[in-house]
């Protein structure tokens, strides 16, 4: 899968899947997560509740509903605490697990935002 860096609204990208940085309870939060939930519609909230939560670095998938992509990969990035609690490794897990899921599904395109860069304050 070739790499391309773009600046675009994640909720408007036509691709196989987008990665949605969320929280451990998969309830609409702020930042990208809020925008994804608004654009996808109320069915996304129901689907997220069925997933039963996430751990930091874990990735789970839902349909994209009203988004132009096919799937949403939900992941929880680490909260930056000075770099002393394996935040770098946990952040790498978010990206690695997203890419591994995309590969297992044989996806051709995946839109990845900067995870934990807004609310989690990670140094990326």
Where are these regions (language model features)?
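Short, basic/glycine-rich phosphate-binding loops at helix/coil junctions
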Residues: 67-81
